Amino acid sequence: MSEITDNNVSYKSKETIDGNYATINFGPTHPATHGIFQNVLKVDGEKIISSEQTVGYIHRAFEKLAERRPFNQITPITDRLNYCSSPINNMGWHMTVEKLIQAEIPKRAQYMRVIIMELARIADHLICNSVIGVDTGALTSFFYPFSEREKIYEMYEEVCGARLTTNIGRIGGFERDFSPVFHEKLKSFLKTFPKAFEEFNSMLERNRIFMDRTKGAGPISAERALNYSFVGPNLRAAGVDYDVRVMQPYSSYEDFDFIIPVGVNGDTYDRFMVRQEEVRQSLRIIEQAYNNLPEGSYKADIPEFYLPPKEEVYNNMEALIYHFKIVMGETEVPVGEVYHSVEGGNGELGYYLISDGGRSPYRLQFRRPCFIYYQAYPEMITGMTLSDAVLTLSSMNVIAGELDA
């Protein structure tokens, strides 16, 4: 094993021969990892004997940053968790604060949230499944979903002006109602997306090469998945029908009719198929929410979290006070302790919040599903080949930004 000394620190190279086994690095900047994390693999030819994972390459101190910010300035931090479906992260945080302050959210705002969150789920699943296709050599299947994802990003822009890290919505609802352009784009999407999605699905679902590559790759049983605290599509692919939207409904999800798809073997193919069906179910939810969108306000009556109109600021002392407190980050919330979770794009995303009555959280912890999945990764790829390790990581949808908070 080669050794490098730099500033009295000793580094041992991982590219070495240990008896009959070779030890190699998979990451931290390997293109197949789709993120910044490292796996040190001990291999016998192509077969993986053991794996040791490393997190922290993209540490950004999410939690401590949030504990030093006003409540309404924490939303942009949540964008950087699973950035493939950031609106879900944003709204999960908003609902956590609303639970603490016991705010009553108008029905229209709840339905608007459902529409945006399900669009985000579709975008997340399209990215994940198209990357699985790329890792099996099906490059064309990568381009089809991205053209549809672009339409979702355009709808984000109409709501908040951003595309990837959205900072969408506010504590209490939205900053503005859906625009006429958004309505037109959503109607067009609901009309054209199903056909485009089935074209993408037909490229992979019954493709013999794709099936041979993904079936049996990176399996995990329902028992082991539960022991690791798996959630989301990875747990459902193992056969457990747990979904936060059904088990602990929020934002009026109990109003909508949809099914929870589950797999059998918990392998890469099942994870792919579960996400494919979840895209169809998300489309059903969006159609129901949009067709039954209630009248009313798009925001709750909590002026301490909403900038008042300029006319009121200039002519009303109370509005001026609210404006000042919001801009200066002086809005306080009651003393309390809450936990709230939402069904994120890759599983249950939870926020544990402790407030001491100040302008910032006393303690805020994120429950990040990717951190949990990554603990099981070495077990799932042991005995597999290197190519199976790549597919397993893609199908688990491990986002590096969530690993170290």
Q: Where is each model-derived feature located?
A:
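Metal/cofactor-centered catalytic core regions of large enzymes
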Residues: 1-405
